[in-house]
C-alpha cells in the first residue's frame, strides 16, 4: 500500500510483518473453514472471521509479492486496498471478541481429539493475527501518512508558513529593480542566496574592498556609482530546517489521515510532485541561463559604471576576481571569461563551437527583426569560402557595444560580444577627408553599401561601389506623387517630374461608358443596343441621355413607378400596327411589361376614352394569317426597329425598377348600377372587348436580336408541330381547368344564397371572304373567362381551332366546347 513509506523506513522489517500478517490471516481463515465444515455447521461468528481474514490475507500477500518481485512503481492496488487494510482488521478483532465471549459463557463440547486441536489452533491464530495486524496498522498510520501521503501537503504547508514568517519578520514591501536588472535577470541572483551564488559573491566583496583600500584616492563616479533605488535585503529562499510549530496544533495532524483514503489519481499526482522535488539542484544550476534565452537577457544592458569598474580592475592586474569566476554555467553574458585574450573570429568560425548556450544566444539574436538594423549589421546566412574569410579577417575591426573610458595604449578592453563568442559587428570604414564633405552634401541619406565591405575592398573598388550606390538611388522604384497617367499620355512641355499636380485622362468619365456607344453609327445602333452591367448604370444613362428632353427626370421616375395608369398604357401601345410574335409566351409577363415598362404619362385620359378605343379597335385577317402561317417573307416584320428609342429606354428602365402583380380592374360583364354583382366587377367597361397585346410582344422580342433570331428560326417548326403539341400546351397552362370542366360544373354560384349566373348567349363570329373579325375583339366569352389571362387563353384556343366557334354554351355542357385532342 505505502510504497514510498516502505522504502524510507525499515523496509526489511516492515515487509516481514506484512508477510507474517498475510500468512496468519490465510491460516486463520482455513482453520475456521475446517471447523465450519466438520463440527460447527451454522455459526455466524466463524463465517465472518473466514471472510474478513481471507479478504485481508490474500491482497496483502499479492502486495508483498508485487513489492519484492515486480517494480513497485508499476503496480498499484489503489483506494479499495487501503480501505481493506484499515477496515478488515477491525472486523476480525470484533468477531474474535465475540467468539471468545461465547466460548467463555457456554463452553464448546469437544467431540473428538481432532476437534480439540482445531479449537486450540484457531484460538492461537486469532490472537497472533490480531497482534500482527495491530503492528502493521500502526505502521500504516504513522509512517505511511507522515512520509508518503502527507509529504506534499507538508511541503505546501511549510512553504506557506515560511512565507508568512518571512513577511512578518522583514515587513511587507514592494521590491524595486533597476532597468538593467529587468533586461538581465541573471543579476538578480547577486542579491539571492549565498549558497547558490558563491561564484558571484566576489563582485560585492570587490566593490566593498576597493572602496575601503582606496579611501585616500580620488575615486571617479563611474567606479563607485551605486544604485539610486533602495534595495531591500532578502533572506535565502531555501531553508534547511522547518520552523517550529505550536505544540497545541493537533488539528493539523488529524488532517494527515485524510490522505490515507486518497484514490489512485491523487496518489499518482503526489508521487509525481515528490519526484520532481527530488531532482538534484546541481543539474538545474548548470542550465540556469537557458530559461532566459527567450527574453532580452541575451542583449547586454548593464550600466556603464559596472563595465568600467571591471575594465579598471583588469588593468590593475587584479586576477583574484577572475580566479573566482564560476567555471560551470554562465551567470551573466558579461561576467564570464574575463581574463581571456582578445580573439577576432568571423561568424563562420563561431559556428564550430559546440556550446549549447552559445547556440541559443545566437538563435536569440537571429530572431531580431533585420529591418531594425542597418545593412552592415544584418545577419546573413551566406557561406564564405575559406580563402575569402582569411583574406577579410584582418580587415575587420570590432566595434564596442558601449563606449569605454580612455586608457593607455597597452590596454584594450575587448568587445563584449566577441568575448562571449557572439556575432562580430564589422565597422564600415570612413571615407577619406578630401571627399568627405562633398559626399555628405550629395548623399545625405543612408548609403546602401554591400553587406560586407572591407578596407582592402574599399581601396580597390571604391569608385565601383559608389557608382553602384548612385545607380541604385537614381532608379526610382516608386511612382511620382499624384501621378495617375503614364508618361506617354503627358505633355513634357507642360509638366515636370517633381510637379505635384493631378493629371486626369481626357476620356475619363464616371460612370464608365464604353467607347462603342459614342462611335457607333446609326445602322449599328438600329441593329444592336449596348446593355450596361447593372440597374444603377442604366438609371444614370437614362437620366443623363440628351435625347430625352421633353419631360422632367422626376416626372419620368414617378410615372415609371406608377402601377395604376392602365388607360395611358393601353392608348400608347394600342394604335401600333405590329404583328404578333408566333412563339409561346407568358401573358402574365406581357401584362407586367406593359404596366411597368411603358408607363410614361403625357396626358391623362378618362375611362370613356379607353372604352371607345376598345370598341373601335380590331385586327385584320392578315395578322391572323401571319400567326398561323410560317412564311419567311414575314420574318422581318418582327425584327423591325423601334419607332421611338425613348419608349424603348422607358420600357427597359421601368422593367428593371420593379415587377408588380397584376391589378386586374377589367371585367367581362357590362357595367350596370342595377346589378350589384356585375357592377362590382364591371366598373362601367364594355363587355367582350379584349386588349391587343401585339405591341407588347413586339417590344419583348425586338429589343434583343438574339431572342428575335431564335424565335424566327423556330417559327416553322412550332407551327408545323402545333397540332401534335396541343396536349402538352394544355398541360402547361395554369388555367386549363377553367376550360375543361365536368358536366356538373357548367354553371358557378358565388354562394348558397346568390342566384345562379345564367350562361350568356352564343356569339357567332361573323366572317366574310375578304375579312374576318378578330377573335380577341369581337368574340363572346363564357362566364368562366374572368380575367385578362383567361381572355387571352380563350382567344388562343379559338385561333387554334380547339374551341368550336359555332357551338353555344347553352346547347350542352362546357365540355362540348372543347374539341378533343387528336
From Swiss-Prot:
Organism: Saccharomyces cerevisiae (strain ATCC 204508 / S288c) (Baker's yeast)
Subcellular location: Membrane
Keyword Phosphoprotein: yes
Membrane topology, record value: Multi-pass membrane protein
Region of interest: Disordered: 271-290, 698-728, 751-783
Transmembrane regions: 14-34, 45-65, 77-97, 121-141
Name the record gives this protein: Uncharacterized protein IRC8
GO annotation, biological process: mitotic recombination
Gene Ontology CC: cell periphery; cellular bud; fungal-type vacuole; membrane
Residue numbers carrying Phosphoserine: 690
Extracellular compartment spans: 35-44, 98-120
Cytoplasmic side: 1-13, 66-76, 142-822
Superkingdom per UniProt: Eukaryota
Biased composition (Low complexity): 761-776
Compositional bias (Polar residues): 698-712
The entry's keywords: Membrane, Phosphoprotein, Transmembrane, Transmembrane helix
Amino acid at each position: 500500500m505505502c510504497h514510498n513509506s516502505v522504502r524510507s523506513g525499515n523496509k526489511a522489517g516492515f515487509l516481514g510483518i506484512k508477510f507474517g500478517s498475510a500468512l496468519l490471516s490465510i491460516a486463520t481463515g482455513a482453520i475456521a473453514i475446517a471447523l465450519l465444515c466438520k463440527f460447527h455447521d451454522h455459526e455466524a461468528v466463524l463465517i465472518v472471521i473466514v471472510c474478513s481474514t481471507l479478504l485481508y490475507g490474500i491482497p496483502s500477500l499479492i502486495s508483498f509479492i508485487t513489492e519484492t518481485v515486480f517494480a513497485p512503481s508499476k503496480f498499484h492496488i489503489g483506494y479499495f486496498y487501503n480501505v481493506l487494510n484499515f477496515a478488515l482488521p477491525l472486523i476480525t478483532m470484533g468477531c474474535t471478541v465475540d467468539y471468545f465471549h461465547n466460548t467463555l459463557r457456554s463452553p464448546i463440547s469437544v467431540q473428538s481429539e481432532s476437534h480439540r486441536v482445531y479449537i486450540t489452533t484457531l484460538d492461537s491464530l486469532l490472537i497472533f493475527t490480531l497482534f500482527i495486524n495491530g503492528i502493521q496498522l500502526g505502521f500504516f498510520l504513522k509512517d505511511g501518512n507522515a512520509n508518503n501521503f502527507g509529504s506534499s501537503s507538508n511541503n505546501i504547508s511549510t512553504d506557506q508558513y515560511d512565507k508568512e514568517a518571512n513577511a512578518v519578520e522583514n515587513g511587507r514591501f514592494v521590491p524595486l529593480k533597476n532597468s538593467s536588472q529587468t533586461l538581465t535577470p541573471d543579476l538578480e541572483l547577486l542579491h539571492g542566496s549565498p549558497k547558490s551564488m558563491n561564484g558571484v559573491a566576489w563582485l560585492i566583496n570587490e566593490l566593498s574592498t576597493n572602496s575601503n583600500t582606496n579611501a585616500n584616492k580620488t575615486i571617479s563616479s563611474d567606479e563607485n556609482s551605486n544604485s539610486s533605488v533602495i534595495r531591500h535585503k532578502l533572506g535565502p529562499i531555501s531553508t534547511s530546517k522547518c520552523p517550529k510549530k505550536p505544540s497545541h496544533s493537533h488539528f493539523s495532524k488529524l488532517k494527515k489521515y485524510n490522505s490515507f483514503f486518497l484514490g489512485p489519481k491523487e496518489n499518482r499526482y503526489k508521487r509525481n510532485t515528490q519526484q520532481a522535488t527530488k531532482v538534484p539542484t546541481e543539474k538545474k544550476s548548470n542550465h540556469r541561463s537557458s530559461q532566459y534565452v527567450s527574453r532580452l537577457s541575451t542583449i547586454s544592458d548593464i550600466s556603464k559604471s559596472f563595465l568600467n569598474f571591471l575594465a579598471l580592475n583588469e588593468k590593475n592586474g587584479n586576477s583574484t576576481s577572475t580566479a573566482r569566476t564560476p567555471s560551470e554555467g554562465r551567470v551573466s553574458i558579461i561576467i564570464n571569461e574575463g581574463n581571456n585574450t582578445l580573439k577576432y573570429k568571423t561568424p563562420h568560425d563561431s559556428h564550430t563551437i559546440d556550446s549549447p548556450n552559445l547556440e541559443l544566444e545566437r538563435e536569440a539574436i537571429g530572431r531580431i527583426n533585420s529591418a531594425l538594423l542597418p545593412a552592415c549589421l544584418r545577419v546573413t546566412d551566406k557561406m564564405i569560402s575559406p580563402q575569402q574569410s582569411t583574406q577579410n579577417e584582418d580587415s575587420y575591426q570590432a566595434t564596442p557595444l558601449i563606449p569605454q573610458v580612455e586608457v593607455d595604449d597597452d590596454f584594450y578592453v575587448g568587445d563584449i560580444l566577441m568575448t562571449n563568442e557572439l556575432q562580430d559587428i564589422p565597422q564600415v570604414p570612413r571615407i577619406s577627408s578630401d571627399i568627405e564633405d562633398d559626399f555628405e552634401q550629395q548623399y545625405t541619406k543612408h548609403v546602401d553599401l554591400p553587406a560586407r565591405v572591407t578596407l582592402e575592398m574599399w581601396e580597390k573598388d571604391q569608385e565601383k561601389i559608389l557608382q553602384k550606390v548612385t545607380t541604385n538611388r537614381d532608379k526610382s522604384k516608386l511612382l511620382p506623387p499624384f501621378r495617375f497617367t503614364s508618361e506617354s499620355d503627358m505633355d513634357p512641355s507642360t509638366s515636370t517630374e517633381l510637379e505635384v499636380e493631378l493629371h486626369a485622362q481626357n476620356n475619363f468619365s464616371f460612370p464608365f461608358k464604353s467607347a462603342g456607344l459614342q462611335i457607333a453609327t446609326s445602322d449599328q445602333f438600329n441593329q444592336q443596343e449596348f446593355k450596361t452591367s447593372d440597374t444603377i448604370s442604366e438609371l444614370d444613362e437614362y437620366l443623363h441621355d440628351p435625347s430625352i428632353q421633353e419631360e422632367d427626370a422626376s416626372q419620368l421616375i414617378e410615372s415609371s413607378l406608377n402601377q395604376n395608369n392602365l388607360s395611358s398604357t393601353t392608348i400608347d401601345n394600342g394604335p401600333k400596327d405590329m404583328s404578333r410574335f408566333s412563339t409561346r409566351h407568358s401573358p402574365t409577363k406581357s401584362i407586367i411589361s406593359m404596366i411597368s415598362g411603358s408607363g410614361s404619362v403625357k396626358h391623362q385620359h378618362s375611362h370613356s376614352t379607353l372604352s371607345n378605343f376598345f370598341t373601335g379597335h380590331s385586327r385584320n385577317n392578315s395578322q391572323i394569317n401571319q400567326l398561323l402561317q410560317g412564311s419567311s417573307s414575314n420574318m422581318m416584320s418582327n425584327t423591325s426597329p423601334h419607332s421611338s428609342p425613348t419608349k424603348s429606354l422607358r420600357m427597359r428602365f421601368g422593367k428593371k425598377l420593379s415587377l408588380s402583380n397584376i391589378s386586374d380592374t377589367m371585367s367581362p360583364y357590362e357595367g350596370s348600377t342595377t346589378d350589384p354583382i356585375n357592377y362590382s366587377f364591371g366598373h362601367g367597361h364594355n363587355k367582350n372587348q379584349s386588349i391587343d397585346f401585339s405591341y407588347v410582344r413586339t417590344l419583348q422580342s425586338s429589343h434583343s436580336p438574339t431572342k428575335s433570331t431564335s424565335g424566327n428560326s423556330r417559327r416553322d417548326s412550332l407551327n408545323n408541330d402545333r397540332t401534335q403539341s396541343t396536349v402538352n400546351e394544355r398541360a402547361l397552362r395554369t388555367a386549363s381547368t377553367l376550360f375543361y370542366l365536368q358536366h356538373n360544373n357548367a354553371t358557378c354560384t358565388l354562394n348558397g344564397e346568390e342566384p345562379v349566373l345564367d350562361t350568356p348567349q352564343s356569339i357567332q363570329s361573323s366572317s366574310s371572304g375578304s375579312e374576318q373579325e378578330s377573335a380577341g375583339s369581337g368574340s363572346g366569352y363564357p362566364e368562366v373567362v374572368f380575367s385578362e389571362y383567361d381572355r387571352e387563353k380563350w382567344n388562343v384556343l379559338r385561333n387554334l381551332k380547339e374551341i368550336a366557334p359555332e357551338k353555344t354554351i347553352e346547347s350542352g355542357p362546357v365540355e362540348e366546347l372543347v374539341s378533343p385532342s387528336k
